[in-house]
Design a protein with these regions (language model features):
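Predominantly extracellular/luminal regions of secreted and cell-surface proteins
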Residues: 47-91
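Short stretches within intrinsically disordered, low-complexity N-terminal or propeptide regions
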Residues: 4, 28-30, 41, 78, ...
Length: 219
């Protein structure tokens, strides 16, 4: 069999903006003769489903709080467990991260950053916030910001829809839905609850897990 080069007519992205069939015309040089040819392209909308969490595959997990003011266990938010222990033995709670010490020092904000070895395509994020009888309080609605980056320097804020779930075992899920996006770095900007705790302690924020769920596409 022989193959011949084809010169295709110019096409624009607008021709593929809607589902359907697009015909592209061109000409092939067949042994010196210009032969008209055409190709039919089927255009479909990608169907997105939300897959499993890739939080546990994070390469670097960091927080903005200086080492001397860090509280509880940062790695707990990627261990796959959303529950919080009573931690009756004292010391750092191994099942949650918090900004307790930093908050008591007067800082109401904190950041947590995920860095991956390769780009991730995300479709949903679920943050599991925790509460206790002392300082831990659920954040106010609409105060958590999520930013994404490919290089860790230039950041874009995600436009999200926040849904606050029901409390179970002192943990409440905050689900963030958004248009599927790619990122190598994901940053969370956290702000403590505004209301007083009524306990003498300043409010702080605690997390048992952050689920970064992949977006899976199919046609």
């Amino acid at each position: 069999t022989a193959s011949f080069g084809v010169n295709w007519d110019d096409i624009s992205a607008d021709q593929f903006a809607e589902e359907g069939t697009v015909t592209v015309n061109g000409t092939a040089d067949v042994l010196g003769d210009e032969i008209p040819v055409s190709a039919t392209i089927r255009v479909q909308t990608e169907q997105i489903t939300v897959g499993s969490s890739v939080s546990g595959k994070v390469m670097n997990l960091t927080q903005s709080i200086p080492e001397g003011e860090q509280s509880d266990t940062l790695s707990a938010i990627v261990d796959g467990s959303t529950t919080i222990s009573d931690n009756t033995s004292g010391g750092a709670n191994p099942t949650a991260w918090s900004n307790w010490q930093s908050s008591q020092n007067g800082n109401s904000k904190a950041e947590i950053t995920f860095e991956y070895a390769t780009q991730q395509r995300l479709g949903q994020i679920v943050m599991h916030f925790a509460k206790d009888s002392g300082s831990m309080r659920y954040p106010d609605a609409g105060t958590t910001e999520i930013l994404v980056s490919e290089d860790g320097t230039n950041w874009n804020k995600l436009a999200v829809t926040e849904t606050i779930g029901e409390e179970s075992g002192r943990v409440k899920p905050y689900t963030y839905d958004f248009t599927p996006t790619t990122a190598t770095f994901i940053k969370f900007k956290l702000t403590n609850a505004s209301a007083s705790t009524g306990t003498g302690w300043k409010p702080c924020t605690a997390l048992t897990e952050i689920e970064l769920k992949v977006a899976q596409g199919s046609f």
